[in-house]
């Protein structure tokens, strides 16, 4: 049995097919998944045609430094909030050479299994 979730692999493949048809590239900005989304994407043969780069910004200072999340938003809303995740996506688009950004933040709980699990996601 594969160590990877077939649903995640299937979703990544569907994303790749759609991006390839559009001629677009994607970037990711991840917190609680620790790069798991980018890993799922790069397991797909040919993903270099539609995947640009990943930002793993687990710490708040990394969210500010690498994808431009403001300290004010982090303090006002918290890292696990829609405004911060939207800012992560916007910042990733500005920093990358991509047409689409996928961003996620959440609370990783003690029951997590692997990097791609979050108890609570935004």
Give the residues covered by each predicted segment.
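Short alpha-helical segments enriched in small residues
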Residues: 1-121
